[in-house]
Structures are given as structure tokens and as C-alpha cells.
Amino acid sequence: MSPTPPETVTPLWQQFLRWAARVGLAKRLAFALSLAALVAGFATYTALTESAPFGETNPRTVTWLLTLDLALLLLLGVLIARRIVYLWIGRRRGLAGSQMHVRLVAVFSLLAVAPAIIMAIFSTVFFYVGVQSWFSERVRTAVNESLAVASAYLHEHQQNIRADALAMANDLNQEAARLASDPERFEQVVATQAMLRALSEAIVFNGTTGAIVARSGYTFALEFDPIPDDKLATARRGEVAMIVSENDDRVRALVRLDRFADTYLYVGRMVEPRVLSHMASAEGAVREFGALESQRGSLQITFTLIFLCVALLLLLAAVWAGLIFATRLVRPISALIGAADRVRAGDLTVRVTERPAEDDLALLSRAFNRMTTEIESQRHALLSANRLIDSRRRFTETVLSGVSAGRDGLDAEGRITLSKFSAARLLGVKDAESLIGMRLAELVPEMGGLLHEAPGRPGLVVQDQIKIRRDGTTPLTLLVRISTEGRGSGMMRGYVVTFDEHHRTWSPAQRKAAWARRRPIAASPTRVKNPLTPIQLSAEPCAASTLKEITSDTEVFTMCTDTIVRQVDDIRRMVDEFSAFARMPQPVMKPCNLNDLVRQAVFLQSSAHAGKIKFDMALPQGPLTVPCDSRQISQALTNLLQNAADAIEGRPPPAEGTELPPGHVAIRVEADAERIAMIIEDNGKGLPTEERDRLTEPYVTTRAKGTGLGLAIVKKIMEDHGGVLTLEDREGGGARVGLVIPQHIPPASGTAAGDAPGGVGTPAETGEEKRHAAHGA
């Protein structure tokens, strides 16, 4: 037992793709991304403008929002690019509705892009103009002037306290002698000087030890705030050192007291807090203004990119919405187009899904379904009618198949619009369809006169006999009938041309009728021959006895009696041939040696024309046995050999100085597995060009004394033996006649002699039959 093959495990990614296609994950994801893009874009705009609900936004929040915007932008871009690629592929493949889908997407995208681009341009320009106004010269001057005013105010305080410090130091230096020895007074003087000069604090200290010599009021801030060394060094040089406190709420001055040993005056004055606050704000504004002005270019680019990102995000969301709307609009139209293509291809069972909504597309779908249903029912009716018409056509063709006449339908300009196979055969064309569209007057110029005459005789049939010859073949006599067809308004619609051979082979029924009519005639030759013998017997002795008594005009008398005897003999011969033709018996098929029959026939004719015509034979070796009627075959050979001898004797006289070649008749017998051909050639005057197709008809002859029954009898014999008679021109002059019979002749049909299928009116075979017989020979 063969092992069971392991089951194929589907990869997870294929399972995921199938699940995604089943639940419509792509559509759901696209909808979620579009909604998220709208929300993220609005949130980013609100955060950048510091509007509610964010208020003053944390930079990290803006960064996260911008990152989310970029991620959504990329995902939406991928989805839209994927959908556009599918649209492009569908258009390249020529899918139904793809071109309309592309146009709708282009229109919706343009409607979404145009406002966004316009707003982006105006917003960028507005932002650029706004930034330029922020950093204009007037704003820069105002900011700098505000800082200058604040600085001037503080500088004024510093100058005032400097002057007060110098004045107070000068007063203390003047009282140095008394104050140095009286510390209490020194402290009172310092307090008085501080109060007079509106100083909030003042102390005198020793620069070496740092000990306080005198103070005014509460001077804890001065005592505990360290004095920078550089300021102390400035004061030692005799200059006034200005000191600003760390919290900028007061201004201080340090000056050296020259009359005291290494002693310094350190005073301070409080500054208005609002003034200091304004000054700090002005300084901060100036710093920020400078920083922003230095980053103005990058700021413009950053805000422009952020705006473009948000705008592009919203734009892609709008484009995706347009794609979805266009798809929903085009899908039923594409279904209608595809269904229409299937209807065009012949599938009338196709139907489109009808939408439940009562909109125009739903009405169109229902109308299409009703239309296809009606067309399908009409098609079934037409097919039934066509089947009925086709059956009637086949019946008509079956009925008309026995009609040998050719029939062509022509339009008003004489072009063939309908042609029967028999018409093509009579005109020498293999395919009747090849005649469609050709002008009959150009194809058969002999019919041009009748076609020109027919329009002048509306309602009547124009007919005449014409002879046509094609490529050197035997002339063909046609009986042509032309009638016109009208539209009922006096305008001619076309022609109906019917033509047939004037002397065509009779049908079997016609032949039987003709042979039946000959039965009572078969007894006539006996009644005609009965008086001929007495006439001949009386003329000869009468001439012999009377000639002795006639003394004058004996030559005339002899000529007259010879004429009587000769004409009586000719009449007897004609009666014998007619009797043989009329009494043609049913052949009796027995095995016979054709070589012996040929030798006997040639011997009789060579004996009759000894010294005048040379007869040659070319026979196969050994006996050539075939079932046939030896008497009829001998009669056929005798008739043909006699015709050859008569053709040689009937040659026209040669031109002066020339001689006719010796008369020569050659007969050869050729056999193959199927046929035996007996071919007789002579160098006589040849076959006539006119009426050649009628040579095998009874009573048709070109000789003065011919009866016109010899070839008719031969043709009848060949037909009874299942063979054919061929008449052709011999190369170099003369005629070539062939008798072709099959090796195995089918049994007789049992018809009586009078019902034989051959007979009067049987023409020679067509050229194709002759060629076939010659090829078989």
C-alpha cells in the first residue's frame, strides 16, 4: 500500500490574505485611516494654534501629533497609490468602465486638490507676510526703545544714588575729626544723612576688618549681602562702585571715606517693583525678539512644512473619499458595460444585480434586465422562425435540385447578388460564391444586350439564345430569360436572370417517353423498305433493256437510271440506320475479347478502303476479356471507323503545288485496373467547331448525306455499357474519338429496349467528362 501523502499546510500569510479578502480588511482599514487622518489633522491644527481644548500646548504633544500625521500620511499614500495602480492596470487591459473610473477619480481628485492648493498658497503667503510684519523695523524699534526706557530709568536711579553717596561721603569727611571720636554721634549723622537723601539704608564699615562703624535704621540686607571684590577694589581707587542686588529690587553705591582709615560708605535705595518688572519683561522681549529674528528663515520653513503636512493629510483623505465614491458610482456602470459585452457576444442570459435604491442607476439596471429578457424571448422566436425557414429552404432546394437551369439575382446596377451552383457550372466557374458582387455583363458580355433591353420592358420577360465560348472550348448555346423587379414606385430593384442549355440532356423520364414514342415508329422502316426493292429491281433491268433501243442521249439515260438506283440505295441505308436506332435492344452482357472485336472492325473497314486509307492497330498483349454486348460494341467501332474514313475522304482539296497527306486511321486499346479505352485517331477534316456539343444528338450532322444517327447510336451503346464517348481534336489536325468502358460493367437495370436510358437529345459529355475519360484511357 502506498503511503498517504501529507496534507499541504497553508502558510499563515496566505491564510491572513484570504481572511482579509473575506472580511474586506482593505476597505475597513482605508475607512479607519481616512477618519484618523481627519481627526489628526484637526488636532494638529488646534495644538499649533493653542486653541481649546489644548490651551498652551506642550511641545512634546505637538511632536507626537506631527509624527502621527506623518505615519497616517504614508499609509494613506500607499493605499491611494495601490488603488491608482489597479486603475491604471484596468485601463491598460481595457476593463469595462475603467476609463470612466479614471476620469471620475481625476475629477474628484482635482476638486479636492484645487482648494487645498489655493488655501496652501494663500496661507503660506499670509504666514510669510505676518512673519515679515513681526520683524519689521517699527516693531524692532519699539522693543529696543522699551528696553532703553527701562535702562534709562534704572540708570537714573544709579546716578542719583551715586550723587547722594558722594555728597554724604563729603559731609562725613568734613566731620571726620569729631565723628571718629564719638561713635554715637557718627551713627546719628549717618542716620540723618540717609533720611535727608531718602536712602533706604546706609552703613559705614572698615574695609580691613569688615566691622560696622555706623548704620542707619535696619541694614540687615547690606550687612549680609557680600560685596564683590571688584566693586571694593573700584571704591579703594576713589571711584563710586554701583551695585545692583540679586533680585534687582534696589540700587546701591560704595564709596571710600578719605578722612577715615580704610573706611567705606555703603548706601542703598529701593526701586519701584513694577518698574523693575517692566524692565525685566522688556529685556526678555528683546532677547526673544533677537532669537526669533535670527531663526526667522527656519521658522518660516518649519511652519510651512507643518501646514503642508496637515494639508496633504487632509487632501489624501479627501482623495481617498473621492476614490471610494467614484468606485461606488462606476461599479454598477461597469457591470452594465460587461453585461452589454456579453450580450454582444451572444449571451442573452446575463443579468445585472438590481440595486434596492430608487436612483437612476437602479432604474437603468432594471431596464437592462427587462431589455435582455425581451431580446432573449425574441431570439428564441427568431431561431424558431429561422429553423422553419431553413427547413422550407431545404425542401425548396431539394425540389429545385433537379432543375438544371441556372439562376442569378442581380441588383439595379447589374451586380450578382444571388447565384445557383448550376449557374456557376454553366458559366464555367467552380464556386458560385465567387460570382457575388461581379457584373454579369462583364462576366458574360453576350448577355449585355439583353440586360440593356430588359429595363425598357418592365413587367415582361426578355429572352433570346446566345452562344458563349470560354478558353477555346466548344461553344455553348444558352437560352436566356431576363425579368426585372420593381419596388412598386416605378423604380427598378434588380433583375432575375434564368438560363439553360438550349439542347440539354434529357431527364430519365423524358428519355423513357421519347423511347416509348419510338416504339410505334419502329415498324415504319419495314413499310418504307418494301417498295424500295421493287423500284431498284425494276430500274436495273429496265435500264439494260431500254439502253439498247435508245440511239440518242444514252449518257443522259444512263445517268438518270444510275441516280434512281443510287438514291434508292441511300434511302435503304437511311432506313436501316433509323431502324437500328429506333429498335436499339437491351445489351446482352457476355465475356468478349475486345482485341478480336477491334480486329474484325478494322478488317472490314480496311477491306472497304484498301489502297486509300491506312489502318493501324495498337492492342495489348494477350486477350482483353470484358463483359459486353459484342454486337453493339462492333457496331460502335464500325460507326466510328466509317466516320473516320468519311472525314478523310471529305478533306478539302489542297492548295496548288501541295498534296494531301495519305489517309491514316490509328486505333489503340489501353487498359488499367478500372477502365478500358478504345481511342480512334484520324487525319481527316476534323470535328466541326459549330454545334459540336450537339454532334451526338439524333439527326444532327454536318455531312451532306449523313443521317445524324451514327454518333447517337454510339453514345447510346456507351451509356448502356456504363461508359462514355469522348470527342476531341487531334494534334496536327483530325479528330480523336474515345470509347471508355469500365472493366466490370454493372448488371443491367432490367429496362426494355424501348425504355433504354439513352436516346434522342443526348449531347456529348462536358469538357470535364471528356478530360476524365481521356485520363482514364
Swiss-Prot record:
Main localization of the protein described in the UniProt heading: membrane
UniProt GO MF annotations: ATP binding; protein histidine kinase activity
Protein name: Nitrogen regulation protein NtrY homolog
Keywords tagged on the record: ATP-binding, Cell membrane, Kinase, Membrane, Nitrogen fixation, Nucleotide-binding, Phosphoprotein, Transferase, Transmembrane, Transmembrane helix, Two-component regulatory system
Membrane disposition: Multi-pass membrane protein
CDD domains listed in its UniProt record: HAMP, HATPase_NtrY-like
The enzyme's E.C. designation: 2.7.13.3
Histidine kinase domain sequence ranges: 523-745
Highest taxon of the lineage: Bacteria
SMART domains: HAMP (SM00304), HATPase_c (SM00387)
Domain PAS: 392-465
The keyword Transmembrane appears for this protein: yes
Residue ranges occupied by any HAMP domain in the UniProt entry: 327-380
Region (Disordered): 745-777
Record's function text: Member of the two-component regulatory system NtrY/NtrX involved in nitrogen level control. Probably activates NtrX by phosphorylation.
Cellular component terms per the entry's GO annotation: plasma membrane
Catalytic reactions of this protein: ATP + protein L-histidine = ADP + protein N-phospho-L-histidine
GO biological process: one example: nitrogen fixation
Residue spans crossing the bilayer: 29-49, 61-81, 107-127, 202-222, 305-325
InterPro entries, alphabetized: 2C_sensor_his_kinase, HAMP_dom, HATPase_C_sf, His_kinase_dom, NtrY, NtrY-like_N, Sig_transdc_His_kin-like_C
Record's subcellular location: Cell membrane
Pfam families (alphabetical): HAMP, HATPase_c, NtrY_N
